[in-house]
Amino acid sequence: MPGSAAARPLRAVKIWLGAIAALIAAMVLVGGATRLTESGLSIVEWKPITGTLPPLTDAQWAQAFEGYKTIPQYRELNAGMSLSEFKTIFWWEWSHRLLGRVIGLAYLLPFLWFIWRGHLGGELKRRLWLIFGLGALQGAVGWWMVASGLSQRVEVAQERLAIHLTLALVIFAAIVWTLRRLDERPVGAVPLRLRITAAALLALTFVQIFFGALVAGLRAGKLYNTWPTIDGALIPSAERLWFQEPWWRNLFDNHLTVQFDHRMLAYALWALAIAHAIDAVRARAGAAARGAVWFAAALTLQAALGIFTLLYEVPIGLALAHQAVAVLVLMLGVLQLERLWPRASASAANLPKSAMAAASRN
């Protein structure tokens, strides 16, 4: 059939994008472990090429350790650390950076091959170039984040950490969306309000992830370890929430405000997800109804993990599970919005004209 002939070149593209999405999800978890083990400042230089190799000799290890000793984190928090202890945190950060390099090559080399083979249409090619540009920007943002903790601070700036994580998941979401748009699937007739609420859910998920990263960067999860109360009340006093000047700094620097915002956003997101699921089921929206239920279920699990992570003062296992399910929730949100979003023919949008013409002659 012409349609299947035209879609054949996209099979390899689908496998490639699926692998990249999986690698980014793994990268987010390794990054989370790097943060939780306080390993992110163990490498004080940014060497995109030569930094691929770790220290191989005793002299190289000693040099790397001496570099770490020059930053405030070592002097104020880890003075007296042994070389073997340094190696533990070094390997986490090195693995995180290596995985970033692997993702870059795993994306760029097949992408160039697909372009050379003429497998990509203009619209798909432009979208993939944009994703590549975001990936390059992410590398720079990663170093910008690390650099914030090398001179005066003992940790990276929490707002830079939040930007770094959010950008990684924007790239992940863009790849998942692009992958789904490669399939030929009709969009059934559903109420416009379902599309609007799905878009609101996805936007709110990104905002919640950003604030979750602020909580992590400030280590605010190790404070106010009660639920549902926080600082002894359901809603803390305005004097405690907004004492910093200018007022907007509280949104980024005030431990209480940041954690309170993260909680309130969670409640709003969960309530909207439940309403969306009920609405989709009542509208007999088919796959969209199932997607809405799955999203609400995953979000409920995520909320429970968040509560237990807080109550137990952020054990690494629970914290990583909380971060992993956040990626799952985001993916389900992307899938739900894409499922409801209008679409053109996948082949027409993603294949080059030459491939479409060849298929039409078959």
From Swiss-Prot:
Enzyme Commission number(s) from the entry: 1.17.99.9
Cofactor(s) it depends on: heme b
GO molecular function, one term: oxidoreductase activity, acting on NAD(P)H, heme protein as acceptor
Gene Ontology cellular component list: plasma membrane
Pfam families, sorted: COX15-CtaA
Membrane-spanning ranges: 12-32, 102-122, 128-148, 159-179, 198-218, 264-286, 291-311, 314-334
Source organism of this protein record: Rhodopseudomonas palustris (strain BisA53)
Keywords of the record: Cell membrane, Heme biosynthesis, Iron, Membrane, Metal-binding, Oxidoreductase, Transmembrane, Transmembrane helix
Catalytic reaction equation(s): Fe(II)-heme o + 2 A + H2O = Fe(II)-heme a + 2 AH2
A single BP term in Gene Ontology: heme A biosynthetic process
Family of the protein in this entry: Belongs to the COX15/CtaA family. Type 2 subfamily.
Lineage: Bacteria, Pseudomonadati, Pseudomonadota, Alphaproteobacteria, Hyphomicrobiales
Annotated metabolic or biological route of this protein: Porphyrin-containing compound metabolism; heme A biosynthesis; heme A from heme O: step 1/1
Keyword Ligase: no
Oligomeric and partner information: Interacts with CtaB.
Biological function: Catalyzes the conversion of heme O to heme A by two successive hydroxylations of the methyl group at C8. The first hydroxylation forms heme I, the second hydroxylation results in an unstable dihydroxymethyl group, which spontaneously dehydrates, resulting in the formyl group of heme A.
Membrane topology according to the record: Multi-pass membrane protein
Predominant location category: membrane
Protein name: Heme A synthase
